[in-house]
Design a protein with these regions (language model features):
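Outer-membrane beta-barrel porins/channels
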Residues: 1-175
């Protein structure tokens, strides 16, 4: 543990909605706001010269702090009951970025776009099979390390052309 370190959590508000737009078709979505500007991570300067990550003697470790911005996340999707056995859905989600250049060491993306598809098949009265796929592209960001507040150290991290894919599969049995 580091003496004087602190972390706080954001105040959040979420508005979910859904509405039938045709027989067996559902439109759904959400707006999620996080007040991240009031929820920061702060690690103070380490005056004893011991690197808390390695436990080894080190030069004076600079203070580290986040500079999170307030964020709004939007999502929208459509679900369709194709038959008594099969239901499908597709959705899209987006969060705008806070800028392509930052000194915040906790920032690894500049917004994102997410695309998802899923299906649920009722094989029998007791068995369901569900599967889903999600693809997310993260916005590019360059993190510039500061040796002291406002003084670049020359160390930069480039997070570019990043994406993540996820797949889920479930077999459900009820009795």
């Amino acid at each position: 543990p580091i003496s004087g370190a602190s972390i706080s959590f954001p105040e959040t508000t979420t508005l979910n909605f859904q509405s039938g737009i045709a027989e067996d078709t559902l439109l759904y979505g959400a707006i999620h706001q996080g007040k991240w500007s009031t929820a920061q991570i702060i690690v103070p300067e380490n005056p004893n010269g011991i690197n808390p990550a390695t436990g080894a003697a080190d030069a004076l470790v600079s203070p580290i702090g986040s500079s999170f911005d307030d964020k709004i996340h939007y999502s929208i999707g459509v679900g369709r009951k194709v038959s008594d056995e099969l239901a499908l859905s597709i959705s899209y989600a987006r969060e705008d970025g806070g800028g392509a250049l930052t000194s915040d060491p906790f920032t690894f993306r500049n917004g994102y776009d997410t695309y998802s598809v899923s299906a649920r098949y009722t094989a029998s009265e007791n068995v369901t099979i569900s599967a889903g796929y999600t693809y997310t592209t993260a916005g590019d960001v360059k993190v510039v390390h500061e040796a002291a507040p406002g003084v670049p150290s020359g160390l930069t991290l480039d997070y570019t052309d990043n994406s993540v894919s996820g797949f889920g599969f479930k077999i459900g049995y009820s009795f």
